[in-house]
Amino acid sequence: MFNKKRYLQYPQVPPSLNPRASTSVVSLNGNEILLHHHDVISGYYLASNPQNLEPDALFNGFHHDVGGTNGDPLVLANTLAKKHTPKKDRHSKINRPQGPRDRRVRLSIGIARKFFDLQEMLGFDKPSKTLDWLLTKSKEAIKELVQSKSSKSNISNSPSECDQEVLSADLPYIGSSKGKAAVGLNSNKCKGGRDAVDLAKESRAKARARARERTKEKMCIKQLNQERNKSYEWNPSVLFQSKSSQQFEVSGPSTNYEELNQESIMIKRKLKQNHPSMFGFQPENATENWDYYSNFTSQSNQLCAILDQHKFIN
C-alpha cells in the first residue's frame, strides 16, 4: 500500500549547513540549524503533500535571519560586539589636588607582613580599621608635620620682602666695604624680617655719614688750594696770618688760643717796625718775603698730606 521509498526519502542538507562544518555562521548557531532540521522533517511527515526544499533556499532563509535584512556578515559582528559590555571599575576614586587617586594600595612584601601582623594582633577583620588605628595614634606627629610645613612656607616668603626693600635703597652708598658686607648679609635668608630691615637701614645711614665726611674733607682741601693760588697771597701780612692759621690746623685742637693770639700780635708789631706801609717794603727785605712764602707753601703741602692720610685711615 505505502511506498517505502516515499517515507525513507529524507531531505538532503548540503555540507555547508552541517553543524560540524568549519564555517563561522554554522559553528556559532549550530543549535538553531538542528531545530530547523527537526522542523523540516516533522513538516515533511505531517504534511499530506510534502514540499521538496532546495538547499539554496534553506541557506538563504537562515542567512537572512542571522545577518539581518541586508545579509551582511559585518552586521553579525557588530551585533555580537554590542552585546559584550565593558567591565566597570567597581572601586571609586578619590580626587586630590595632584589628580584622582585609587583607593587600592599595593604594599611591598615586608610592609605587607608587618601590616597583617599588626592587624592580627589588633583583631580587626578589615585593613581599613587597621589604618584608622594607625592614623589616630599618629595625630601628634601629623600636627608637628603640618606646623613645620607652614613655618617653612612663611620663612620662604619673608626673604622676598626683604630683598625688595634692600633693592629700593640708595645704591650710591653701597660702594664701601661695610656697606657691601651689610648687603651680603641682607641678601641671605632673613631669619627675622623686621630685624633684617633695621640692619639695612642702619648700614645705609652709616654709609651716608661716611660719604658726608669725605665730601667735607675734599671741600676743605679745595678751599686751601684756591687760597694758596690767589694773587693777594704775595702780601706779607696775609702770608703771616695764613702761616699762623695753618700752624693751628697742623698742631690740632690741643693748641691754646691765647698763645696764638700773642704770636699774631708780635708778628703785627714786627711788621709795623720793619714795614711802615702795606706795599712799601724795601728791596733788602725781599729775600725774607720769599722765605716766608716758601715756608707757607711747604706747610700747606704738609697739611694736604696729613688730610689725605686721615682720609685713607677712615
From Swiss-Prot:
Sorted alphabetically, the Gene Ontology cellular component annotations on this record are: nucleus
Question: What's in the keyword line of the UniProt record?
Answer: Developmental protein, DNA-binding, Nucleus, Transcription, Transcription regulation
* Keyword Glycoprotein attached: no
Give an example GO molecular function: sequence-specific DNA binding
Please describe what this protein does: Transcription regulator involved in the dorsovental asymmetry of flowers. Promotes dorsal identity.
User: What does the UniProt entry say about where the protein is found?
Assistant: Nucleus
Highest taxon, organism lineage: Eukaryota
Task: Cite the R domain residue spans from the record.
Answer: 201-218
Domain TCP, residue spans: 87-145
Q: Does the keyword Transmembrane helix apply?
A: no
Matching PROSITE patterns, A to Z?
R (PS51370), TCP (PS51369)
Please list the GO biological process terms of this entry: determination of dorsal/ventral asymmetry; flower development; regulation of secondary shoot formation
Pfam families given for it? TCP
Description of the deletion phenotype = Petals are more symmetrical than in the wild type.
Q: What is this protein called?
A: Transcription factor DICHOTOMA
Q: Which organism is it from?
A: Antirrhinum majus
